């Protein structure tokens, strides 16, 4: 959610929305999501009486900052370049790759010629996956248009909502929370954006606001029990059972659902940074 976010780029390309504005729209919701997780962690920590680690010394903090400096500089370069109109979001991707290679080879010295080969292979594999998803989604959109199903769905949604943006967002949130458990964000955006965006325009909803709600929603869906994709990733890392993590995730899920409701029904949280 916090820029630079690939999901905002995907949504922007589908809905023909400004990616720069979408990046700005994601700042406050992203910070709210982070704050929600912090509050949940503090509550759980006090309830379980977890031990507090000793504070890091000034020397340790300075060392950690120096080690992380070049990595922290990347989002500054990307966002600064985009917001400063130095380069487009597409060009920012190329700049970030070049910067990452330079830092990895000459600063951290963790990238060798052999690793570059592996990186290129992994990049090709990832790109191919995304292209197949894009191809399928484009075909899906084409079939919707040719069969005029998009107009039928739009008419159905307008009848169900009765012209109410509140009811529309209730439907959007329920559908995406369920879809987010089973689908990755890119696939879900390609499937549902063409369905929801026209209805949102009919209801006078800002496409930037809709995109922010959809992406926050899908982020929550990724760790919503019982089948949230990120739950299984966390199980593999922590070497625990899905039942254990499902119980532990509840406070975080509640906090993020509260944030989702705030972002959904207070459009200013998404649009206040857009001049």
Task: Identify the residue ranges that each predicted region occupies.
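Alpha-helical transmembrane segments of multi-pass membrane transport proteins
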Residues: 1-275
């Amino acid at each position: 959610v916090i820029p630079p976010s690939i999901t905002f780029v995907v949504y922007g390309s589908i809905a023909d929305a400004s990616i720069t504005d979408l990046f700005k729209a994601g700042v406050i919701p992203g910070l709210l999501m982070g704050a929600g997780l912090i509050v949940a962690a503090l509550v759980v920590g006090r309830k379980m009486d977890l031990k507090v680690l000793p504070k890091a010394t000034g020397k340790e903090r300075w060392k950690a900052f120096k080690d992380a400096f070049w990595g922290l500089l990347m989002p500054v370069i990307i966002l600064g370049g985009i917001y400063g109109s130095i380069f487009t979001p597409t060009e920012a991707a190329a700049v970030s790759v070049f910067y990452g290679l330079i830092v990895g080879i000459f600063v951290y010295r963790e990238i060798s010629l052999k690793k570059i080969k592996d990186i290129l292979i992994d990049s090709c594999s990832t790109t191919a996956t995304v292209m197949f998803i894009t191809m399928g989604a484009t075909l899906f959109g084409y079939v919707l248009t040719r069969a005029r199903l998009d107009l039928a769905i739009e008419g159905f949604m307008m009848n169900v909502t009765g012209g109410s943006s509140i009811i529309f967002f209730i439907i959007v949130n329920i559908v995406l929370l369920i879809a987010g458990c089973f689908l990755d964000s890119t696939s879900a955006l390609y499937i549902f954006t063409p369905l929801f965006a026209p209805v949102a325009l009919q209801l006078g909803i800002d496409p930037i606001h809709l995109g922010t709600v959809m992406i926050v929603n899908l982020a929550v869906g990724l760790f919503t029990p019982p089948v949230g994709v990120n739950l299984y990733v966390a199980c593999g890392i922590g070497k625990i059972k899905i039942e254990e993590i499902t119980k532990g995730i509840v406070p975080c899920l509640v906090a993020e659902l509260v944030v989702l409701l705030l972002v959904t029904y207070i459009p200013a949280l998404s649009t206040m940074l857009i001049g």
